From Swiss-Prot:
GO terms (BP aspect): cell division; proteolysis involved in protein catabolic process
GO function terms (MF aspect): ATP binding; ATP hydrolysis activity; ATP-dependent protein folding chaperone; protein dimerization activity; unfolded protein binding; zinc ion binding
HAMAP family: ClpX (MF_00175)
Record organism: Lactobacillus johnsonii (strain CNCM I-12250 / La1 / NCC 533)
Keyword ATP-binding attached: yes
Family, similarity comment: Belongs to the ClpX chaperone family.
Identification of the protein by name: ATP-dependent Clp protease ATP-binding subunit ClpX
Swiss-Prot/TrEMBL keywords: ATP-binding, Chaperone, Metal-binding, Nucleotide-binding, Zinc
Positions contributing to Zn(2+) binding: C13, C16, C35, C38
Amino acid sequence: MANEITEQEEVKCSFCGKPQSQVKKIVAGNGVYICNECIDLSKKIIDDELKADSIKETKDLPKPMEIKKQLDEYVIGQDRAKKVLSVAVYNHYKRISQMDIDSTGTELQKSNIALIGPTGSGKTYLAQTLAKILNVPFAIADATTLTEAGYVGEDVENILLKLLQNADYDIERAQRGIIYIDEIDKISKKAENVSITRDVSGEGVQQSLLKILEGTIASVPPQGGRKHPQQQMIKIDTTNILFIVGGAFDGIENIVKNRLGKKTIGFGAENGLNQVDADDWQKNLTTGDLVKFGLIPEFIGRIPIIATLDKLSTEDLIRILTEPKNALVKQYKKLLSLDDVDLEFTDGALQAIADMAISRRMGARGLRSIVENSLMDVMYRTPSDDNIKEVQITKDVITKHAEPKITYKEDKAEKTSEATK
């Protein structure tokens, strides 16, 4: 036949229609073909869209002053630490956006953060609130549970698993999350001198954390626990995960004061020597002091930003009880209002709660348990007693375990009596 095809028809790109002879390469799929030119064009379109998204993310990212303002709504005091965190977090996420759009090859290094302050000063809460403001996945880990590979305890990769779980196993979201490692001071070296015994929960853990702090592709066991060769692993890039480590670092102030050649405040101070202000050691804290405390230089090098937190005063604790958006007093008022009961705390009660938290050396962390204990009997009774109108917590309820004052609604007339068990 005259019109019989004697040669195989030349393959054409399914997108632009160009035959194979006019392009360098054609990739075949299931009945579909794409040429190298269309691949390059598609890549450019995707890159441009990613660049536009990254620019939008940078514009939408709260500025340091905005972050600080939002932190002020939830966290009382600690202005210095909040400023340091606001700037550091802003620069961190701006850096991530820059990585997506910058073609100059200029690399901005990651800056992890160390929070140093006494127990109950708000270290964990600050990190939690930051993640909430930025709407990123967040995970908390306890450094004291970690051991280096090969020993009984948790692998450092399990920290990443917690973040992945909190991101609903969305790896991309997890890779832009925040991880807070508490009690980091507890994995300091036992002594400056090298020991012949293995420090599996101290320097060894610091060494194990180095890579994930700096940025690496970590293999995470999906079910947690120890890794074994036959197990399927999840790969997580830690390059853009912000790590915040925190600890009380008891005794670090003495290291700073000794370095400055100053004596401790109080009766031990000799005449003629410079007195040390309460916050002087915080202003003069250096990475060298942390090395002296027991953190290895390589570890400190990966946490260049240090923010110190002050010990909370009684006035601070009273403000924490009443002022933030989710203040404890507001929370318990809301709880009892669901049973149509008004809750009030007298000024004396608030003062007593704050004093008790300080005497227990728990700071803000101890407030909830004190308030919870004072309200236990009330919260037990009110759901079953429709006649209760108002509950007042006084100083004696906190300090002497007295009964709260309860106002009843009785035939539209109010009658106040002491609650009975």
